[in-house]
Amino acid sequence: MNRKYFGTDGIRGTVGEAPITPDFVLRLAHAVGRVLRRTEARPTVLIGKDTRISGYMLESALESGFNSAGVDVVLLGPLPTPGVAYLTRAQRASLGVVISASHNPFADNGIKFFSAQGNKLNDEWEFEVEATLKEEPVWADSASLGKTRRLDDAAGRYIEFCKSTFAHDLTLKGLKIVVDGAHGAAYQIAPMVFHELGAEVIAIGCAPDGLNINDGVGATHPQALVNAVLANKADYGIALDGDADRLQMVDAQGRLFNGDEVLYLMVNERLSRGEKVPGTVGTLMTNMAVEVALKAKGVEFVRAKVGDRYILEELERRGWLLGGEGSGHMLALDKHTTGDGLISALQVLQACARSNQTLAQLLSEVVLFPQTLINVRLKPGQDWKNSAELAAQTKAAEIELGDSGRILIRASGTEPLLRVMVEARDAEQARACAERVADAVRS
């Protein structure tokens, strides 16, 4: 059974186009409120948002929808997605709601939900909400309508939580750190976290105007961070995305480190302290060099589908703690219930401080394999899955690469494209194999 509205990370789209319209969002909140009231007489919902101008409108629609179903609302204001997850759990709320489209431009927005435990909701819950949306609204009577209040110190509570995950015997004194907030939800919080731990902070991407979120800054545009680190002779650079659940880091030389490398560092740091790490979870896109390096240390490596939701599901199924993907979504389940860019950055800085080594030194054992990614546009109705030529070229590439590379073919979820990715120790070999497979799709 397919969901009509929910995707892999809530409901997302262009503001003013279905389903991101105020009337639909009001109906959505009303339906969610009715679902909550089936198991709880007087639920309380927390609502946080990023800095998009449309957040005001959607916040009002959510508030009205929940109140109309007899649900109380607590408004958190601009707050990172992981901050909403944390406060939902800490405040013993029934549900957390985030208004954000993450790394997308300002014209997009979305709604995602967290359970009372601070976890993303499962498919069954989403199916129940969509089924309730099909029903006629059942408005609460006047005496049962929900109320709304603000939690004025939401940001401060989350700042203290982030700092609590950093070793108390360590400090960031003496470090100059550039922090790029993507003009998003962490624009005030991120600089404060590192400043209060002792660092000299240079903030960029921390002046939102409602329209500039992720615009040339943040984790999806890391060149701004690289330039600022080099210009200010900083020790580190930290870039978040619009809702601060994603991380990219830069060292003093301007070298960019992606999520694959951060995952290896997080695992290796724990191994160096004598902790047992039976396994970790990456995705289909995680660089093979990370898998090889971790297996050499006796750490099992498992690939999930792309998306932090699927990484989390695999971690919970296996009882493991650490996972992540190259885009910068990192999970450390003994620190937080969801991916958190700030906490991930603190874990990296903690590893550097404990070892008295730089990022490059800590990652010297991992040399990422070159990757070639080719997007091939599919013809209308093209049956690529049953193409004999594609199957033959894919098999030939797999034989040629052996244990020194891999090939991944997957369809885009949003465009008529087939993505052909080849990874190998040799860049030219990766390119040649990818071209042959892509040509088979085009033929």
From Swiss-Prot:
The active site is at S102 (phosphoserine intermediate). Keywords: Isomerase, Magnesium, Metal-binding, Phosphoprotein. Binds 1 Mg(2+) ion per subunit. One of its GO terms (molecular function) is phosphoglucosamine mutase activity. Activated by phosphorylation. Mg(2+) binds at S102, D241, D243, D245. It catalyses: alpha-D-glucosamine 1-phosphate = D-glucosamine 6-phosphate. GO terms for cellular component: cytosol. PROSITE patterns: PGM_PMM (PS00710). The keyword Metal-binding applies. It holds the Pfam family PGM_PMM_II. The keyword RNA-binding does not apply. The modification Phosphoserine is found at S102. CDD domains: GlmM. Belongs to the phosphohexose mutase family. HAMAP family: GlmM_B. This is Phosphoglucosamine mutase. It comes from Polaromonas naphthalenivorans (strain CJ2). The gene is glmM.
